[in-house]
Amino acid sequence: MNFRDIPSELVNEIIKNVDMSGFMEILTNKNNTSNINYNIVITGSVGVGKSTIAQLTYEILKDLFDNVQIYPEYISYKLNDVSVGNLMLDLKINKLITAETFQHFVLDIWEHQLQHKGFSNENCINILERLPEDAVTCFTKESYMNGEISELGWDNINERLKNINKKYKVPINSECKFAMIDNNNKLVNAVQEIINIIIDDIKNGVKNRVFGLIVDDNEYMKRIITRGRDSEINNKMDIYKHYNEFYSDLYNKLSFK
């Protein structure tokens, strides 16, 4: 796998305790399973549990449907078992590469996956950690606003994002149905809520769904420290405040569109 593995014991425990009976009606109709084109986006700020929930959702769905793909975010993506995303983020934080170079690297990871996993193919369930759009509108914008990226660099990155979305038919947030998921408490409860919505979406022909994860401030900081990524721990705290505000605003917009 080219994403961060989660313990098989956790996968088995969650699957054992999640009610998936709602899939039976879908699976008994071959016409339903052969014509599913559905994009699932697991999004949110840093430390809200995106990777874990995206991977658990993948583990559940891949055993039920024929063509399920997962698209980890750059920080979870591995090349030859090396977390290149984490290395690149360290270089950016320590100013050994420019913010613009780093943001193009993030889009490189997206484009590599979208191309080689056949994102634009029909009859596929795609699970994405965030959208490419978020990389630019939240994270690149922070670098642009504080002067790390020039006006020309900002324009070039935005143009590249538009081209990627168009070429691979990637949805944007405003095109997606939205559901906010509280991931403060038992993980199995959050996964169950997501599975219930996925079942309804497939039955009703929904094509794009964003699940926005939320946790309280103490919980997300505890997760950042516990998983021990130096690149995250060394980041300035006001950066996380910006990320949290961005996703809070995004959730409000998507909830009331």
Residue ranges of model-derived segments:
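Phosphate-binding P-loop
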Residues: 26-37
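Conserved substrate/cofactor phosphate-moiety recognition/catalytic segment
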Residues: 59-109, 137-143
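N-terminal pre-Walker A segment at the start of P-loop NTPase domains
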Residues: 3-28
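Hydrophobic anchor at the beta1->P-loop junction of P-loop NTPases
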Residues: 42
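A glycine- and Lys/Arg-enriched "phosphate-lid" helix/loop adjacent to the NTP-binding pocket
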Residues: 136-249
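Hydrophobic positions on the alpha1 helix immediately C-terminal to the Walker A/P-loop
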Residues: 53, 57
